């Protein structure tokens, strides 16, 4: 994943946060993110159906993710006071089911947006691209999130 590409997406997150601040409903941030991402040249789909199959049969047609950017990066938006690890697990499941490499859980209800953007990487892509799992390397993550990304990668390997 191109580092400049992910920086541009994160820049859109910062812009929405700087304009709106914390404390609004998730749906408001979602609409603002769609507008900001499109203004920056991204293709964005919202409330995308995530089909779940079991033994070849569709068993859950109504699971939905918040945003998918250029059919590559999933953004799961939150506006909560109590961030829970289940949000990262939820995003990881979306990444796996949609066959995407990278996603971010973003909690807009914070005083520091930089500390509230959580990268999640699909293990399938880590292995196929030769990422080091135990060598403290997460080369696709932006530098400002590298330690957070490394933690998430290592954590996702040991559920």
Segments (PLM) and residue ranges:
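Intrinsic disorder/low-complexity segments
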Residues: 1, 125-159
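Interdomain/boundary linker segments immediately adjacent to catalytic/signaling cores
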Residues: 1-20
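Conserved catalytic cores of phosphodiester-cleaving nucleases, focusing on short active-site segments
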Residues: 21, 65-83, 94
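Active-site metal-binding core of divalent-cation-utilizing nuclease and nuclease-like domains
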Residues: 25, 30-72, 111-124, 132-139, ...
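Nucleic-acid nuclease catalytic cores
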Residues: 78-126, 135
